[in-house]
Design a protein with these regions (language model features):
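Alpha-helical transmembrane segments and their helix-helix packing motifs
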Residues: 1-161
Length: 161
């Protein structure tokens, strides 16, 4: 919508050039760098989500979400959802307005940028934050083990009938 709504034509085409430059900068990362930036980003995003769950008021939810997200933006970390916008906007703007950007192709964007960032986001969110919370709160909880065992007994009884 942004590209085909002719928004990049604003400011004499400078906005189109800025969109392409932003997308190109995101796709110029090496695969390990993109992966690590993805891990660090989603650690902060997941912490923001968990902190907002802990807050009771809307103002607390907003404030606890704001700071980690602001930090990941300031640090230049990468999130796959943001990359889906910036990369696609850059590719479409480049094609629509004829702005040359060496190395900015769909395959390079998908496999050298979006894939490692997405995998990094998964590792950061599920691997670091998820496992961290499990180790901190659920690993040594006898209730969780008993609940699973009780559910398994109920399933075994149900299978007998």
């Amino acid at each position: 919508m942004v590209v085909y709504g002719h928004t990049p034509e604003l400011f004499g085409g400078a906005l189109a050039q800025a969109i392409v430059n932003a997308g190109k900068a995101r796709t110029d990362l090496s695969i390990p760098e993109a992966f690590i930036r993805g891990i660090l980003c989603n650690i902060l995003v997941c912490i923001a989500v968990w902190m907002s769950f802990a807050a009771k008021r809307v103002s607390g939810k907003l404030m606890t979400s704001f700071w980690p997200v602001m930090l990941f933006v300031l640090c230049g970390f990468e999130h796959c959802v943001a990359d889906m916008y910036f990369g696609v906007a850059a590719l479409l703007t480049s094609a629509e307005y004829g702005i040359a950007a060496e190395g900015l192709t769909w395959s390079h964007f998908l496999f050298s940028s979006l894939l490692p960032i997405t995998l990094g986001n998964i590792v950061g969110g599920a691997g670091v934050v998820g496992v961290g919370y499990w180790l901190a709160y659920l690993k040594h909880t006898p209730y969780a083990k008993e609940t699973v065992e009780e559910e398994q007994k109920e399933l075994d009884i149900a299978e007998e009938y």
